[in-house]
Amino acid sequence: MQPSSNNCYDTGLREECGVFGIYDLDGADVSPSIYYGLSALQHRGQESCGIAVSDTSGPKGHVKSYKGLGLVNEVFKESKLEELSGNIGIGHVRYSTTGSTTVENAQPLVLNYLKGSLALAHNGNLVNAMELREQMENTGAIFHTSIDSEIIAYGIARERVHSKTVEEAILRTVKEIRGAYALVIMSPRKLIGVRDPYGLKPLCIGKRDNAWVLASESCALTSIGAEFVRDVAPGEIVTFDKTGNLKSEFMPVDVKKAHCIFEYIYFARLDSKIDNISVYEARIRGGATLAKTYPVDADLVCGVPDSGLASAKGYSEESGIPFGLAFHKNSYVGRTFIKPTQKERESSVKIKLSVLESVVKGKRIVLVDDSIVRGTTISNLITMLRKAGATEVHVRISSPPFLYPCYFGTDVPSNKQLIASSHSTEEIRQQIGADSLGYMPIEELQNMVGDLPICRACFDSHYPMEVPKQDISALLES
């Protein structure tokens, strides 16, 4: 998703979103389940959220929807959920990849068109969004948002007019789009899930009694008491209708799979399982690899909450250095990495974390974190540890240095904002004030996920598909 503030595409940070869908064949209202599912996916986006529902036994194509800026529990009060009655529905949490943070850009998107209604929620990024949008506008399309998700929704609606089924319209649309996408789509009588052929974005299937569920992560299934069935396969379109059966078909493409490694390093929740791999165990393995690669004499291994904790435990187990908690986290402050502006990121670090002085005073600390993007956050944490009496701080990072932008929806900014693109490891170590610094060797990255084929383009520029020839921010400034 890539719009700009002065026309349709924004030069801001890319996002990660969460999608959720449920179809209760017994006719029960699903909005409370969507609420809890989105709450479990809140870590994937904190700027806006939305829910769209319909009643499969009511007037065909009548969709009730509500969306707003803020967290799920801020936007949806009990009275609002009661208004959203229906037995089929989808939901979305957003951190903007494209478009400004306005309620117009919140999802799900709901379209009313010749064949009825369509609601869509999207996680991911299209690399040919600007090209497709221009083509559509030249044929009379009028867009109401600045997000590339509307391009997908409009494409499906346009193709549906000439297709026998919505699935056929989706198949025609995905032939035109390039990039990363996990979609949940609600037509008047169907719930549909779509995953891009590379498998870049996660999507899984669950079941609770007589209800089918789709979600970005398995933790959202657990939150509503649903059983995990399986992941949606890369390139698969799954449909649930009134028969209660799962219908599956695949896009007629054969590409090399490229699952986003950043899900396992940072984005996914610790209790999720994605493509048969436990996120927790992947991070434990990452920490163990760091301990083997960068041993150091130290008294305590600590992780940066939350995504650095499991890797720190893995480092501790492999090295034999005790694991401890160096920070208290204020749970009511959001994630610093997905704050919209640098100023907000910097100010929220100190509000979010405070050092446990009695734990670190007089000790040599190994501090494990998932990544260094700009270096500001880790520098602040090292300063806080030293002020609390830590004698040494050795930093270990469970990802390689970020060198290239991501075009597929992960919050990796342009090259000029990536500290590793213009500084050596030693220069970064000096700049952040660490006694030593070790990144995950890129050749060891695969160990986290076994034989799962991964995309690691933000580290080595080997993109799984053709991407813009120059950095997207440069394109937008021209």
Q: What positions do the PLM features span?
A:
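A conserved beta-strand->alpha-helix junction
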Residues: 76, 145, 150-153, 323-334, ...
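PRPP-dependent phosphoribosyltransferase catalytic core
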Residues: 174, 189, 225-231, 383-478
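Extended, hydrophobic alpha-helical segments in both membrane/secreted and soluble proteins
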Residues: 301, 308-315, 319, 323, ...
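Conserved short alpha-helical segments that host acidic/polar catalytic motifs at enzyme active sites
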Residues: 1-234, 239-298, 304, 392
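Short, glycine/charge-rich flexible loops or terminal/linker lids adjacent to PRPP-binding catalytic cores
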Residues: 320-365, 376-379, 403-409, 413
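Mobile, glycine- and charge-enriched loop segments
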Residues: 354-368, 372-373, 397, 472-478
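Secondary-structure transition/capping motifs at alpha-helix termini
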Residues: 141, 162-163, 295-299, 317-324, ...
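Flexible loop/turn segments at secondary-structure boundaries
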Residues: 97-98, 128, 200-201, 221-222, ...
